[in-house]
């Protein structure tokens, strides 16, 4: 009888704990959604000139970083109009004879594949998100299969000064970074590029969220 009561009590505890965790996760998800909407509204209000001004300042600061200068294999996102513009960074990488890998989205997964030149960039097709990427059926060198990455430059919706990141909600970078850290012996530098307005005091996070090494803004 005692044993049966103990089993029943233990199951009740497990159920209650599971319910609490579900409520916590639902609260985090709701808070993230609200912050995404707020930040996207703020970034939308920035004019093109201000976005470009901040982008160039971030580019200048990036070029002075040892983590960037000493890296050979670099992952770089191809920016949208509401992100720090990465076109000058891309040109600089090719000028310095570094190797660049860009995101290619396949369903719910993202891989980093090699980009060969600015001419290669110009010929890339657009996705439904209006982002350039190589065709999913095209054979390209995969960064994690050919030596890994030294540096990953990361986009996002919001950040904190100590490296917390809020993405767009699809989990592409979260899953990729997790895979990258498992596959590589050497941990790559993780640097976010952001507008001043994207910095927050805090961001709701879960245990699976990975902290960045640096959030680079104009300031």
Predicted regions and their residues:
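Short polar/charged helix/loop
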Residues: 169
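N-terminal active-site beta-alpha-beta segment that forms phosphate/nucleotide-binding
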Residues: 26-148
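Active-site/ligand-binding-proximal alpha/beta "capping" segment
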Residues: 155-157
């Amino acid at each position: 009888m005692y044993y049966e009561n103990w089993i029943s009590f233990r199951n009740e505890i497990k159920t209650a704990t599971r319910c609490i965790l579900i409520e916590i996760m639902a609260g985090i998800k709701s808070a993230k959604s609200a912050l995404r909407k707020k930040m996207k509204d703020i970034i939308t209000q920035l004019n093109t000139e201000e976005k470009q001004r901040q982008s160039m300042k971030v580019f200048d600061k990036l070029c002075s970083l040892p983590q960037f200068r000493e890296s050979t294999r670099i992952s770089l996102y191809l920016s949208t109009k509401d992100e720090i513009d990465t076109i000058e960074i891309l040109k600089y990488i090719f000028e310095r004879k570094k190797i660049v890998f860009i995101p290619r989205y396949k369903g719910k997964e993202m891989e980093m594949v090699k980009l060969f030149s600015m001419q290669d960039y110009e010929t890339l097709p657009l996705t439904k998100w209006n982002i350039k990427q190589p065709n999913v059926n095209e054979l390209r060198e995969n960064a994690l299969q050919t030596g890994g990455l030294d540096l990953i430059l990361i986009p996002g919706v919001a950040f904190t000064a100590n490296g917390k990141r809020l993405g767009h909600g699809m989990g592409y970078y979260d899953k990729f970074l997790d895979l990258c850290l498992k596959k590589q012996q050497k941990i790559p530098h993780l640097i976010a590029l952001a507008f001043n307005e994207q910095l927050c005091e805090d961001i709701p996070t879960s245990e699976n969220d990975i902290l960045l090494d640096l959030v680079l803004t104009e300031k």
